[in-house]
Every structure is written in C-alpha cells, then in structure tokens.
Amino acid sequence: MTEEQVLNTHNAEILLSAANKSHYPQDDLPEVALAGRSNVGKSSFINTLLGRKNLARTSGKPGKTQLLNFYNIDDKLRFVDVPGYGYARVSKKARAKWGKMIEEYLVTRDNLRVVVSLVDLRHEPTQDDIQMYEFLKYYEIPVIVVATKADKIPRGKWNKHESIIKKKLNFDKNDHFIVFSSVTRDGYDEAWDTILAEL
C-alpha cells in the first residue's frame, strides 16, 4: 500500500480484543502496532488519526488496556493497540503476563508491518521506553517513534526535547521520529504518510 491509495480513515471500528495468537484475526491484512507506556496518549493518537473522538477509549486510569485491541480501518489495514507498560499499580504477575502477550504478538505476527512506539515529548524516555525500542531493534521490527503531547511544550523547545529523547534511546537515524499533538494535530500528515509507506 502506498500513500496515494485512498484510505477512508473514518471507516474504522474495533474488531476484537485478543489475549493470545489463537484469538488474532485470521487473514493477511497488514497491521500497525501501537506501543507505549501507560498514559502516553496512545488512545488519543488512535482517535486523532482516525478522526473519531471515542473509538479508542481514553482513560484517567493508566493500565486499563489489558488485551491486544485490533481496529479494522476501511478493510485495508488494522491498528493493534498494545497494553500500556510501566504502570506501577499493576501486579508483577500481571505485568509479566502482559509482557509475554506483547512479545508473542510482536515477534510472531506475520501481519505486523511496523510498530509505532509512543513516548512523551516532555520527558526523557523511561527504562521501559528504552527497552521497548531496543527490543524492536534487536528483532529487526520496523519502528516509528512518535513523541506525543507536543502542545504541552513551546514549539521553540521541540528540537531540544527531540534531541534528548533520541540520545537516550540511542536512536537509529534511519528510523522515523515524529513530533505529534492530538490537540493541535501537529504531525498528523507525517504520521499517516510514514505509516502508509511501511505497508
């Protein structure tokens, strides 16, 4: 799929939630996984890209997404919302279970084309953010880093924050880095163009 192909992003729905591969959709539609720590703005990112307010439920309670949520977009591709990581109030046992579920999907899923790894532009990446990026690089899974909540920082400081994040991640210059805001829609076109180019 290329950027030129028409994609009706408003024609989107949540398809199913899955705990393991036996529940995954059984077809060959390309998938884009979205990963990031709890409350990084993943649901807002999905809703903004799809032009819907409440398709992905935003929550004041981090760690609410406990399954892989598959979103069908115009019967041409799927977004897969991965459980938010790094939330302290979730038990170690639950975190380990989520970790195994996420790893199984990322490593074994043939449909997966690219992972959008979301980080918060305001803060240095956490150890969890760094581990996720290193994991994706180790398994040679294509990755796009999206730095969310850009509207919370003056535009003149974006480059400084971007540099800090890239340094902490040991960012591969061949990967894409997008500064994004679900409030101002900064990064919207770049995000879609970059995602579609990977399909």
Curated annotation (Swiss-Prot):
Domain EngB-type G: start-end pairs: 28-199
GO MF term list: GTP binding; metal ion binding
Top-level taxon in the UniProt lineage: Bacteria
Listed GO biological process terms: division septum assembly
The protein's required cofactors: Mg(2+)
Amino acids binding GTP: 36-43, 63-67, 81-84, 148-151, 180-182
Record InterPro entries: G_ENGB_dom, GTP-bd, GTP-bd_ribosome_bio_YsxC, P-loop_NTPase, Small_GTP-bd
Binding site for Mg(2+): S43, T65
Xref: Pfam families: MMR_HSR1
GO cellular component: a single term: cytosol
Key words, A-Z: Cell cycle, Cell division, GTP-binding, Magnesium, Metal-binding, Nucleotide-binding, Septation
Function as written in the Swiss-Prot or TrEMBL entry: Necessary for normal cell division and for the maintenance of normal septation.
NCBIfam families: GTPase_YsxC, small_GTP
Name of the molecule in the record: Probable GTP-binding protein EngB
Source organism per UniProt: Streptococcus thermophilus (strain ATCC BAA-491 / LMD-9)
Name of the gene: engB
